[in-house]
């Protein structure tokens, strides 16, 4: 099942992504070998929906009862359990049972349940960040992470300095939300001519934030150029690709101009307005944004070309 594969990928990547600028609490020093052995033995088992329920009612049951067996007061448990297991549990809950439309109902509720102590609360913030926000997680999802961030910036468990990184992340996450008009910006071509994103005329626009010589950027470019569906849309001028370089090394940018097809728009942000005004999230490059004819966001900050194809085929 593709979702389960994504979850496994997310966990292998997210475990290493404990952000150094986020608040942590120290735990008691322990014997490392004993701790590792204990961590392997500990586990969390979510609630199980009654077998006789119809599928939709099972989903609703799991949304309501998934964490019933978890003791939110037991900080010893989260100090000792292998975090990979808890990241898996969180990923299954957030991506398997919570659609974007219900994120504002269930994600703040979970964070409130985790508010029994600062240690428990920051642990669940770490889980949410690893699954929903880490740039390497294929499960990252701002629509589900925003309610978590909004809870964090209001939490009495964090002081004003501890809330600052969450306030920053919230400001960025609120940009270019799905279904809303994408932030406009001016780009400059190699000829020196300038134009704006919103003046691109096409049924669809694919923003490709890229860096010169970036291996992952090359992979994404190859996926786009070898997609029969995308190439057909580009040839019919229904889809336009805007490759945008947000940084300052124009010599490197010019050296790599030939890396991209001539049919694509290849520009740079001369004033670094995208970064300075935080118009787009630049924490991970490459990044793709798919926009419709009115420049409403259909896909945000992703690298999944297959997902772009899926949206365009619907």
Residue spans of the language-model regions?
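Short active-site neighborhood of thiol/selenol oxidoreductases, capturing the structured segment around
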Residues: 195-226, 240-242
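Structural microenvironment flanking redox-active thiols in thiol-disulfide oxidoreductases
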Residues: 221-258, 272-276
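C-terminal motif of bacterial Sec signal peptides marking the signal peptidase cleavage site
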Residues: 13-16
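Sec-dependent signal peptide recognition
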Residues: 2-8
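Non-catalytic, surface beta->alpha helical segment in thiol-disulfide oxidoreductase systems
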Residues: 279, 283-314
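Short acidic-hydrophobic, aromatic-tinged amphipathic segments that line or gate anion-handling sites
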Residues: 188, 265-270, 301-302
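Oxidative protein folding and maturation machinery
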Residues: 19-193
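Short, internal strand/loop/helix patches
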Residues: 257-289, 293
């Amino acid at each position: 099942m593709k979702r389960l594969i994504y979850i496994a990928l997310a966990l292998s990547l997210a475990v290493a992504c404990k952000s150094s600028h986020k608040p942590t609490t120290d735990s008691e020093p322990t014997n490392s070998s004993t701790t590792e052995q204990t961590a392997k033995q500990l586990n969390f088992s979510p609630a199980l929906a009654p077998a006789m329920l119809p599928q939709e009612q099972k989903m609703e049951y799991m949304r309501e009862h998934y964490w019933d067996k978890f003791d939110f007061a037991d900080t010893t448990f989260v100090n000792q359990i292998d975090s990979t297991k808890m990241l898996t549990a969180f990923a299954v809950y957030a991506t398997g049972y919570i659609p974007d439309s219900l994120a504002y109902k269930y994600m703040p509720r979970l964070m409130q349940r985790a508010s029994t102590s600062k240690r428990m609360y920051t642990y669940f913030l770490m889980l949410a960040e690893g699954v929903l926000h880490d740039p390497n997680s294929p499960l990252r999802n701002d629509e589900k992470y925003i309610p978590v961030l909004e809870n964090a910036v209001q939490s009495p468990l964090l002081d004003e300095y501890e809330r600052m990184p969450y306030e920053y992340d919230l400001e960025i996450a609120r940009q270019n939300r799905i279904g809303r008009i994408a932030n406009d910006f001016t780009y400059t071509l190699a000829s020196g001519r300038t134009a704006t994103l919103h003046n691109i005329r096409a049924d669809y626009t694919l923003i490709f934030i890229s860096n010169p010589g970036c291996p992952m950027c090359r992979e994404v470019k190859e996926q786009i150029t070898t997609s029969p569906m995308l190439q057909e849309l580009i040839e019919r001028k229904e889809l336009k690709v805007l490759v945008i370089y947000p940084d300052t090394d124009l010599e490197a940018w010019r050296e790599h101009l030939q890396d991209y097809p001539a049919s694509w728009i290849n520009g740079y942000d001369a004033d670094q307005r995208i970064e300075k005004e935080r118009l787009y999230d630049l924490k991970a490059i490459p990044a793709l944004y798919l926009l419709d004819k009115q420049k409403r966001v259909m896909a945000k900050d992703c690298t999944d070309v297959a997902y772009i194809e899926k949206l365009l085929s619907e």
